[in-house]
C-alpha cells in the first residue's frame, strides 16, 4: 500500500502528496496514521498531489502526517450484523454496543443496476394515512418524496409512515439520517426499540453537526446497506423487499454544495454545485427495484423558503413516483397531516392501476376542492350569502373533505393526547365517496376534524349534538 504525506489542510479539504507513480484513484479512501480520520480522494492536482475531503473533523491534523492509500473506496459493513445498530458514515458503531459483526463489506460507490435487471411493479403500498392513500398512492418498490418548508411536518409524517409501514412490513428497513437533528435520530431509535422492530432496522446517521464529507456520503452508506439486502439472494433465489427512509435529501445536496465550494468549483444557479443533477442522479438511480428484490424509498425533501422551483427540490422531483407536498397554509388551519391534495401527485393515479372506484373518488374530491379554491376570493369579498345554492353545497362539502383529510397520528399521541388512527384504503374511499355523494351534508364540518373512519365522524357529530 502506497503512502503519502499531508501537505496542506484548509478546513475539511486536505491535500496529500504521493510518489508520482503511486497516485491514488479518485474515490480511494486514505487512512491518516495515528488518527481515526479517513480521507476520500476527490481530485488529482498533478505532481503526485491529490485533493481529498475529510470524513471527520480535521482538528489536530498537521502537515507531514503519513496517509496510507487503502486502494479501494470507503467500504462499510453489510448484512444481518447491521440490523438493530446505529452506525456512522464509515459503518462504525455509535451506539456503544460493541463492534458490528458483519460477514461482508461493500464499497459505497457502486453502479446502478442495468436496464435488464430492473423490474417495475404496480402493487400498491397502503399507508393508513387517508390523504396519501386517496390522492397520491404509493407503489411497492417506488420512490416517494415528502416536500415541505421548515416546520410543516416532514419528519412527523415520515415517522408515521415508518410506524404504519415498517411495523406491518415483514421485510427490513434502513434509515439514513442525512444532516438532520441528532434529537430526531435519538427519537427514531427509541420509537423502533419500544415497538420491538429494532432487529429489522439498520440506522446510519450523519447529523447536522458533522463535517460536509460525512453528510455527503452518509446517504450512499445507507443505500449500500439497503442494496445488499435487496441483492443478496436467499435459498429460494430471491432478495428481500427493503424500505429505505432518507431524512433529508436536501441536506445531501447542501453538503455537496459545501464540498464543491471547498474544492474550488464554480457555483451554478443559486450557489449550488455545477454537478447538482449528476450527484442527484447517481444516488437516485441506485434506489430501484430489481428482479430479485425491491427498495421502496421514502425521502423527506426540505424546500428552502417554501420555493418548489429552487434547483434542489426541482431536481429531486424528476426522480420520484409520488410527491407528497406539505403546505404551510393547510398547517396554519390546524389540519394535520398538512398535505396539499391539489399539489401532490402520483404516477399510480391511473384507473388501470388503482381501480375505477378509487380513481373516480379521487377525481371528484379534487374537483370539489378546486372549485372551493376558485370560490374563496368571492367568499372573501361578498360572503357566503352571494353564492348559488349549488356553490354553497360544494363549499360545504369541500370544507368537510378538508377536515376529513386530518387524522391523529400514532407518533404524535404524546403531543395531541388523542390515540393515533390507521384507516384502511377501503374505508378511506368509502368515506370520501359518501361525502361527495352528499350522504353527510347534515353533519357539522367540525365532526370530520381529527377522526379516523367516517363512522367516527358520525359518532363525534352525535356527541356534539348531545352536548348541545
Curated annotation (Swiss-Prot):
Pfam families the record matches:
ATP-synt_ab (PF00006), ATP-synt_ab_N (PF02874), ATP-synt_VA_C (PF22919)
Could you list this entry's UniProt keywords, alphabetically sorted: ATP synthesis, ATP-binding, Cell inner membrane, Cell membrane, CF(1), Hydrogen ion transport, Ion transport, Membrane, Nucleotide-binding, Translocase, Transport
* Keyword Lipid biosynthesis (UniProt): no
In terms of superkingdom, the source organism counts as Bacteria
Q: How does it sit in the membrane?
A: Peripheral membrane protein
Please give one Gene Ontology molecular function term for this protein: ATP hydrolysis activity
Concerning its family, UniProt says: Belongs to the ATPase alpha/beta chains family.
Report what the protein is called.
ATP synthase subunit beta
- Its source organism is Xanthomonas euvesicatoria pv. vesicatoria (strain 85-10)
Amino acid at each position: 500500500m502506497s503512502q503519502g504525506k499531508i501537505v496542506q489542510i484548509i478546513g475539511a479539504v486536505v491535500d496529500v502528496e504521493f510518489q508520482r507513480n503511486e497516485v491514488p484513484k479518485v474515490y480511494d479512501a486514505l487512512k491518516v496514521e495515528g488518527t481515526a480520520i479517513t480521507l476520500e480522494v476527490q481530485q488529482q492536482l498533478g505532481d503526485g498531489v491529490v485533493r481529498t475531503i475529510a470524513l471527520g473533523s480535521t482538528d489536530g491534523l498537521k502537515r507531514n502526517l503519513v496517509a496510507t492509500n487503502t486502494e479501494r473506496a470507503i467500504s462499510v459493513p453489510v448484512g444481518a450484523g447491521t440490523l438493530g445498530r446505529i452506525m456512522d458514515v464509515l459503518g462504525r458503531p455509535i451506539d456503544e454496543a460493541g463492534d458490528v459483526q458483519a460477514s461482508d463489506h461493500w464499497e459505497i460507490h457502486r453502479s446502478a443496476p442495468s436496464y435488464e435487471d430492473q423490474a417495475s411493479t404496480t402493487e400498491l403500498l397502503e399507508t393508513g394515512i387517508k390523504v396519501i392513500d386517496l390522492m397520491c398512492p404509493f407503489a411497492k418498490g417506488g420512490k416517494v418524496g415528502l416536500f415541505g418548508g421548515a416546520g410543516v411536518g416532514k419528519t412527523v409524517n415520515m415517522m408515521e409512515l415508518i410506524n404504519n409501514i415498517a411495523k406491518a412490513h415483514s421485510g427490513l428497513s434502513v434509515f439514513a439520517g442525512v444532516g438532520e437533528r441528532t434529537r430526531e435520530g435519538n427519537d427514531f431509535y427509541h420509537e423502533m426499540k419500544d415497538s420491538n422492530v429494532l432487529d429489522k432496522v439498520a440506522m446510519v446517521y450523519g447529523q447536522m453537526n458533522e463535517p460536509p464529507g460525512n453528510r455527503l456520503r452518509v446517504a450512499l452508506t445507507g443505500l449500500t446497506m439497503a442494496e445488499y439486502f435487496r441483492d443478496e439472494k436467499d435459498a429460494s433465489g430471491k432478495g428481500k423487499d427493503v424500505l429505505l427512509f432518507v431524512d433529508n435529501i436536501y441536506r445531501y445536496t447542501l453538503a455537496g454544495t459545501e464540498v464543491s465550494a471547498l474544492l474550488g468549483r464554480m457555483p451554478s444557479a443559486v450557489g449550488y454545485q455545477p454537478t447538482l443533477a449528476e450527484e442527484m442522479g447517481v444516488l437516485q438511480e441506485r434506489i430501484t427495484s430489481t428482479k430479485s428484490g425491491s427498495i421502496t424509498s421514502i425521502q423527506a425533501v426540505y424546500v428552502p423558503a417554501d420555493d418548489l422551483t429552487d434547483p434542489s427540490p426541482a431536481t429531486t422531483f424528476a426522480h420520484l413516483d409520488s410527491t407528497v407536498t406539505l403546505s404551510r397554509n393547510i398547517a396554519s388551519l390546524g389540519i394535520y397531516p398538512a398535505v396539499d391534495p391539489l399539489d401532490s401527485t402520483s404516477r399510480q393515479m391511473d384507473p388501470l392501476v388503482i381501480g375505477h372506484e378509487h380513481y373516480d373518488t379521487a377525481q371528484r374530491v379534487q374537483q370539489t376542492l378546486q372549485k372551493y379554491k376558485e370560490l374563496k376570493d368571492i367568499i372573501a369579498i361578498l360572503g357566503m350569502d352571494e353564492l348559488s345554492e349549488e356553490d354553497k353545497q360544494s363549499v360545504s362539502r369541500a370544507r368537510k373533505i378538508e377536515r376529513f383529510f386530518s387524522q391523529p397520528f400514532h407518533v404524535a399521541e404524546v403531543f395531541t393526547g388523542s390515540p393515533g388512527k390507521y384507516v384502511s384504503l377501503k374505508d378511506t374511499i368509502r368515506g370520501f365517496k359518501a361525502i361527495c355523494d352528499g350522504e353527510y351534508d347534515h353533519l357539522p364540518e367540525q365532526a370530520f376534524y381529527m377522526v379516523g373512519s367516517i363512522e367516527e365522524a358520525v359518532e363525534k357529530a352525535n356527541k356534539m349534538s348531545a352536548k348541545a
